[in-house]
């Protein structure tokens, strides 16, 4: 079984989702997890770390060190479900190919529309001539992240504990 599949299967059985997996030099394995309903606390990271350590031993996974973390305030957007969950939030999107000479966009995500497998995501942004709407598919994205919203008064971003 592929490492990402092994981790994803383990996490889904525990009620978490795999956001990102990184293999860093010197055997470091970084796993970013989330729980859509509640977000991630340090106790969640500890629990997942213990479980993955056990699974990796049983499955004979080669690694030196394991780090388990929340995706952070600037959470990456990887799957269609991420765009659905964070519709209405501000995001920074870099496309694989330029649209009108531009690859980088920052704006408000709109919920995906269209038939299954052909969904288009909307991003409202400030264009050269005023407000504009960019429509793109998940496959058009090189990378996308939420724009961190830091509110020192204690209000939280929808769907997150962070």
Swiss-Prot record:
The keyword tRNA processing does not apply. CDD domains: YlxS_C (cd01734). Gene3D superfamilies: Ribosome maturation factor RimP, C-terminal domain, RimP-like superfamily, N-terminal. It comes from the Bacteria. InterPro entries: Ribosome_maturation_RimP, RimP_C, RimP_C_sf, RimP_N, RimP_N_sf. Keywords: Cytoplasm, Ribosome biogenesis. It is found in: Cytoplasm. One of its GO terms (biological process) is ribosomal small subunit assembly. The keyword Mitochondrion does not apply. GO terms for cellular component: cytosol. NCBIfam families: PRK00092.2-1. Belongs to the RimP family. Required for maturation of 30S ribosomal subunits. This is Ribosome maturation factor RimP. The gene is rimP.
């Amino acid at each position: 079984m592929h490492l990402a599949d092994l981790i994803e299967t383990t996490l889904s059985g525990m009620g978490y989702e795999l956001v990102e997996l990184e293999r860093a030099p010197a055997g470091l394995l970084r796993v970013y997890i989330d729980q859509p309903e509640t977000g991630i606390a340090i106790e969640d990271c500890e629990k997942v770390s213990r479980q993955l350590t056990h699974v990796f031993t049983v499955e004979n996974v080669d690694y030196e060190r394991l780090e388990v973390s929340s995706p952070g305030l600037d959470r990456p957007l990887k799957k269609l479900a991420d765009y659905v969950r964070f519709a209405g939030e501000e995001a920074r999107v870099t496309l694989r190919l330029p649209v009108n000479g531009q690859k980088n966009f920052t704006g408000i995500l709109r919920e995906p529309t269209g038939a299954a497998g052909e969904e288009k995501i909307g991003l409202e942004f400030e264009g050269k001539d005023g407000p504009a709407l960019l429509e793109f598919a998940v496959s058009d994205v090189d990378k996308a992240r939420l724009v961190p919203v830091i509110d020192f008064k204690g209000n939280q971003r929808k769907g997150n504990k962070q």
